């Protein structure tokens, strides 16, 4: 799914163990920000640009990034504290739910972790009022908002020309 391959930092080759500590939260572009999405944080600008510009395969690229040998061989644990869940907007701001009983999610398997984390995110969204999730407070519900926000990211990474040529990012429902 990658035209130019994924560029990972050298430090990943130099380290012995990788422990991911992702949040359990909403994401304006991809719907959720869990463990697998953490791989994006390692990338150089050129890899991020390809990821967002050729958005028709963005979900597949997220999965591909987690199969890079360095990550696959060195990732030991994925650990999330589900005591505060970013239930709208994301990745940096939105409505935070603090459940009465929190949940700590830990797994050696990133897919298993993300399935539990996603279920926890969805469960905590069900208790929200309509006021907390309407309109611009949860833009992921609107296809126009998702594709426009992705073009803004492409513009920031590659410029106006790349933004004009960017593929449409299609949203997938979470709940």
Regions found by a protein language model. Give the residues of each.
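Extended, low-polarity segments enriched in aliphatic/aromatic residues
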Residues: 1-175
